[in-house]
Amino acid sequence: MGKTGNIEHVEERVESELMPPSMYKVILNNDDYTPMDFVIEVLQVFFRKNEQEATDIMLTIHHQGKGICGIFPFGIAETKVIQVNQFARQNQHPLLCSLEKA
């Protein structure tokens, strides 16, 4: 019979600290031409806001010049900005959606 060697398993525990993703605010900017109803529609369709939330954000945009639609990781924020800007152009509105670091 062969001699069985003693196999030693060494486990190395590597603790990696996962950093939360950087978050970005998606912002709608006021202009003098985009109808308020269109802004409310954008907030409901792209940001899943109910009618009251959408109206409140729209009024903030109207009175303060801009309003926060939501805070997301960069990839999601960037996608929403692109989608909203394309939708606004398709509907011939100058509404501008942008993002900034939260």
Swiss-Prot record:
SUPFAM superfamilies: ClpS-like. One of its GO terms (biological process) is protein catabolic process. Involved in the modulation of the specificity of the ClpAP-mediated ATP-dependent protein degradation. InterPro entries: ClpS, ClpS_core, Ribosomal_bL12_C/ClpS-like. Binds to the N-terminal domain of the chaperone ClpA. It comes from Shewanella sp. (strain W3-18-1). NCBIfam families: PRK00033.1-3, PRK00033.1-5. This is ATP-dependent Clp protease adapter protein ClpS. Belongs to the ClpS family.
